Amino acid sequence: ETAWGRTPAQPSLFPYTSPESIWNEHRESTRGRDLDITGMSYAQLERSPLQWPMPEGAVQGKVRLFEEGVFPTENGRARFVPTPYRPVAETRDAPYPLALSTGRLRDQWHGMSRTGTLGRLFGHVQEPALHMHPQDMARRRIKAGDLVQISSRRGAILAPAQASAEVGLGQVFMPMHWGEEFLSGRSSSGARLGGVNTLTTPVFCPDAKQPELKHSAVQVQRTDFAWHLSALAWLPADTVLRQRTALQALMAHFEFASCVLFSSPTVLGQTGRSGVMLRAAGQQPPAEALLDEVHTLLQLDGNDVLRYADPKQGQRRAVRLQRHPDHTTLEAFLLSGDTRAHDWMSTLLREAQPAQDYGRALLAAGVAPPLPVRPADHTVCTCLNVSEQAIQTTLTGCLGSPSERLQQLQNTLRCGTNCGSCLPEIKRRVRLHLQAA
């Protein structure tokens, strides 16, 4: 306010004493509108979710908007606007034979300025990736996890490929959230690579003003880099966001880079641990000083760190272990050069599995672990930390119709009973389990 020239004699533009007072102002701004929530209170929302609209005097929200048949027009009647069919702005052709669509992730919101600061919300989808039909991948000799270049008439980005039968042939999908804060790199000309919207068209609907982000013509090609980096580290809660920001500032020094948070599995309301995952690649190893900076930010520069280095071959490995009374856990690691051990070492770290028997074998890590590692389980319900395996196991004891089995499942595990965003996936798993029975 001082920067805007406000004097002490003028009223404050931010007269808020609590988060509730901010919310109360927002609530009042909805009065009389189709999203009227003036019947809600902050205390009610603290206890449980509420459905809008819920105007003042209502005891519960409406199940359907405009259910009484009155619409926000001058005469209260709905208006239908005839809109002629318009083809997509950009058609596929030989140079760009695939249709790129973008959209939301279940647990993230738009630019992730808020959700992107919570490691637990990366539990459902852990890192940026391009989703492709398995047959389209096979035709291009692309395997899951391979880095690919996605090109459109406007630019190009790099990302790992991920097989998905939910994506149709000739189509690819990338979540709209993966901007340059999480997915970046450096082009051959030295320019910083942007996120997914580097690829999309600038065309928008003349009526609704919605951008045409659901269809862009692209080409996808496997990209083979000679050098790779993979690093994960648990970090102190009071510094993890600051260290992630510092790592993000280094992303443009690599030809490909992604940087995201992760967290320990916890139930909503509990405080878990948080960490950062950095992945990078290039045709040549980067400067040693850059890798030293990454080591420092991931707290891999202390005396308690096991190290191996072969600068001539571009190989570096660093491992930080934590001793507990009855076991040892992997707290951080960095693989530079040969990163084939990423998957099982990541599981070892994220799941806090005992690591005391691995010792220095972690520095000679290859594609196969020297000792068995329990596979990581996929999180379905982020709010209540319910895994796919827990759902499958519980469903074996459920009986009745799909709705009855769903109710039994929720009575036991409570999955899908908080925010509800995972409910479609849970219902799908109930149907699939019933079909397989």
Regions found by a protein language model. Name each.
Residues V260-L362:
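C-terminal catalytic lobe of FAD-dependent flavoproteins
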Residues G76-A78, Y85-P87, G103-D107, Q135-M137, ...:
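Short, glycine-/Ser/Thr-/acidic-enriched flexible segments
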Residues A368-H378, G400-T417:
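Immediate flanking context of iron-sulfur cluster ligation sites
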Residues E1-I37, S41-Y42, T115-H131, Q135-G302:
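Long, contiguous, secondary-structure-rich segments that constitute the structural scaffold
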Residues R6-T115:
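Long, low-complexity segments enriched in small/aliphatic residues
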Residues G190-S216, Q356-Q389:
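Cysteine/selenocysteine-centered motifs that mediate thiol-based redox chemistry or coordinate metal-sulfur cofactors
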